[in-house]
Amino acid sequence: GLIGSIGKALGGLLVDVLKPKLQAAS
């Protein structure tokens, strides 16, 4: 449904933002 789609979009955005920080930290 709509809520699931929004959740997926936010989750993808979060991963895009956090992944570079995690890679930079390691």
Curated annotation (Swiss-Prot):
Expressed by the dorsal and submental skin glands. InterPro entries: Frog_Litoria. It is found in: Secreted. GO terms for biological process: defense response. The keyword Transferase does not apply. Keywords: Amphibian defense peptide, Secreted. Its main location: secreted. GO terms for cellular component: extracellular region. This is Citropin-2.1.3. It comes from Ranoidea citropa.
